[in-house]
């Protein structure tokens, strides 16, 4: 029996099935907080064949102090520190957010070490992965760097952080999804919701997606155990995604009216430049940035 706590969280009782929420979670987090699912995903990402979930040490930021910048998933295994993030709305600022996350994680790992001593403090090498399944068409694989956000380019970059975004919508990254059934099922489920919302109300679309997935064996065990919570999370996430898109559009319009067009255009120009470097087609760039073909040509020349 699931009980809602006073902070809009969740607490589910049961051996080996404890889920505590003091924040509004996402379906992606809920699925991959399960160590069996997370190990399956890590194996698919790395080509490893680990079978013991106990090898995973999950260290996702959960301290209330850092609640405003809580990351989705981070864990240690194989001497590496992996940070996985899910995005349904493309965000070019994720390299900066990952910098904040890794700083807090390293700080926690070394709190008992002598940082002023003569012995070198050893750190696990990190990797930063973003799983994207938004409505906007994006490339199958895209690299974003912290230096993409710098106000100007320098010959020698003193601080860099590289992220890899993997598009899991539709037919993208099919080999990865074949290697990780949970990721594939999650992608199918969210694709169904997005498709059905084109012709029906959100709650009805989510309910239909859940029924179909149960009958097709997609996330079957998970949805049987957590159907009500999964439905609520899905509705919340989709509403949040639409809200973020509306906020971004409103901010753009506000920037025009407030006379900040030059700064916003420079930011858009940098985004377009990066998309071109990543191999996106003109049609994809026009769709994502909501610009005309003539405007795209202007940004290319600028």
Walk through the language-model features, giving the residues of each.
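Elongated, amphipathic alpha-helical interaction scaffolds
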Residues: 2-302
